[in-house]
């Protein structure tokens, strides 16, 4: 006795369509748990800007997906704990040192990230700014994997002629392109400092009488 049940053409097509759809979903990985857990890299960039140079660099490094956070705003709100795949900081060099508020921020901050980078902007002299930041950040248990400087138009008007500065080709686009490529590939590198640059900073500190633990008390 034949117990097989005949199905209609409509039912057969329905079942066939379901089978094809299931196969397509499985092959595309939509049913994979791993695909559900995939996430895009998150980058946070903190910035301190006095004349706009550092904000410009921070925006260029941020691209479309990173989060830009103002250091003065974070200090004002008392926010110091952050976590991301990558954390960066951009600030201007004042007397070869970080601005006092940047120093305050890094000393209190708890930054959890697989990769940390810092880009320091300056207009004339950087001296041993990279080593100074490395010491300060390490002392605060916030060591950085990548530290670089980039020379910009020096727009601190009391000391420099803006028109003359604009005539000088400082290769900003080329330098920024290299820094961006380094950071995107997570290079581990600190810009080298010469002994001459260290001596220049020591001489500056002696002449200026600045407290090396404070630096310039300049606001953003």
Predicted regions span which residues?
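N-terminal export signals
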Residues: 13-34
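C-terminal segment of N-terminal export signals and the immediately downstream linker at the start
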Residues: 28-50, 56-64
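Ferredoxin-like iron-sulfur electron-transfer modules
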Residues: 40, 201-220
């Amino acid at each position: 006795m034949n117990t097989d049940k005949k199905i209609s053409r409509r039912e057969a097509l329905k079942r066939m369509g379901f089978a094809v759809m299931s196969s397509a979903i499985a092959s595309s990985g939509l049913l994979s748990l791993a695909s559900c857990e995939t996430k895009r890299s998150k980058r946070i960039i903190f910035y301190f800007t006095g004349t706009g140079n550092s904000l410009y660099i921070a925006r260029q490094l941020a691209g479309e997906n990173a989060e830009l956070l103002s250091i003065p705003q974070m200090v004002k709100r008392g926010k110091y704990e952050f976590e991301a795949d990558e954390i960066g900081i951009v600030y201007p060099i004042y007397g070869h040192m970080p601005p006092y508020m940047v120093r305050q921020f890094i000393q209190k901050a708890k930054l959890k990230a697989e990769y940390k980078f810092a880009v320091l902007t300056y207009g004339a002299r950087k001296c041993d700014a990279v080593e100074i930041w490395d010491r300060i950040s390490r002392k605060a248990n916030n060591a950085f994997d990548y530290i670089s400087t980039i020379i910009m138009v020096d727009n601190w008007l009391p000391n420099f002629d803006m028109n003359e500065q604009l005539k000088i080709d400082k290769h900003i686009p080329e330098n920024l392109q290299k820094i961006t490529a380094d950071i995107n590939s997570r290079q581990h590198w600190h810009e080298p400092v010469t002994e001459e640059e260290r001596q220049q900073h020591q001489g500056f500190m002696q002449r200026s009488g600045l407290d090396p633990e404070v630096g310039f008390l300049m606001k953003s």
